[in-house]
Amino acid sequence: MSSAPLFYGGINVYLQQHIPIFRHLPRFIDRVLDYPRLVSSFAKLPASIDTNDLSALALSMVRGEHGHQRKEVRRLVKWMHHQSRPDVIHFSNLLIAGPVREIKQSFSIPIVVTLQGDDIFLESLSQPIRSRIVSEMQELATLVDRFIVHSRFYAEKMTRYFNISPDRISQVPLGIDATDYLHAASQDRKQADTRPGRRIGYLARICPAKGLHLLIDSFINLKQQSSFDDLKLWVAGDLSEADRHYFEAQEQKIKKVGFDADFYYAGRLSRPAKIDFLRQLDLFSVPAPYQEPKGRYVLEALASGIPVVQPAHGAFPELLARTGGGELFSVDDSGALTEVLANLLTNHEVRSRLAKEGPEGVMATACADHAAQATMDIYRQILSE
């Protein structure tokens, strides 16, 4: 198959949604707007997010050939006609699977869709448009041959949410390319035992859904106890303009009680910087109040040899049962996170055991090779049916 062009380029999608003339302009203009460097530059610009705009765009996208981006659907299908026929077509989520109808009409090719958080986005939208989008997605789901999820919890949730029969959902345990994380974890960490202060870390998107405010509350509670006066909180991750006010409010909470000198925000990190960040922690927690379908950040911490503390809901109980390397806290107990963090911070023996379990568990069950093999097995099964 030749090198694929860009389909559904962000600039074109936006303009086709908002300015009718762009739905009919010739391809040479679309090609200019799809220029990768131009798309990348626009993606980096700060932008405020209008929920109504997002809702309308999502509805249009899932409607496929009946939406405002129908030109993109037709171009994709036309391009596929001139390529070697693929054995399987795999969409990374159902929200972008609008072309499925046209693809099914043109080709006899199995369609696979990974479900990994579509519902989280949908639940952020207001009614009645949310119900319209879900209804369109339920209709799309009937055309999909197989769905892939990363946990039993999410499989059960998706059967209800999109009216999918359980036999059409397969589980592929989440995996990551952990080589450099594992290498870092295997190196001598004696300097971690001699550095001043203990460190709790958070590495995920900065937003209410990931629960940074809950971790900050626990950090403050611990710091107010004399036995944790050396404690520090390190935070890293993407911060959007939409969530800046939320983050500033959290910073003010810490400053108000005089602990700002022990709080550090590292910003968005490259992969090498992530690895270095994680190696310097004693504990890791992203106490997401919503039911996380994946939890990739947990695998990164575990692979780095950092014990994790996560809520006992969503994908986390299954993930930690598989890998070890962490403990769960009850989401129904407001003091449970603080209690588990305190117990681990004061119990070096348990922390050491968990730090050893994490990399071993990731290596045995959660590397990218395991996920790739499980996905290939599903492809083979579909093709044999």
Segment roles from a protein language model:
Residues 1-78:
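A conserved catalytic-core segment of Leloir-type glycosyltransferases
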Residues 191-210, 216-219, 234:
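Conserved donor-binding/catalytic core segment of Leloir-type glycosyltransferases
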Residues 336, 343, 350-365, 371-377:
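A short, well-ordered alpha-helix in the C-terminal region of glycosyltransferases
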Residues 247-269:
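Nucleotide-activated donor-binding/catalytic signature segment of Leloir-type glycosyltransferases, i.e.
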Residues 153, 175:
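Carbohydrate-associated surface elements
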Residues 307-310:
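Short hydrophobic beta-strand element within catalytic cores of glycosyltransferases
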Residues 322, 327-334, 343-349:
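Conserved acidic donor-binding segment of nucleotide-sugar-dependent glycosyltransferases
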Residues 232-251:
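Glycosyltransferase donor-sugar binding loop
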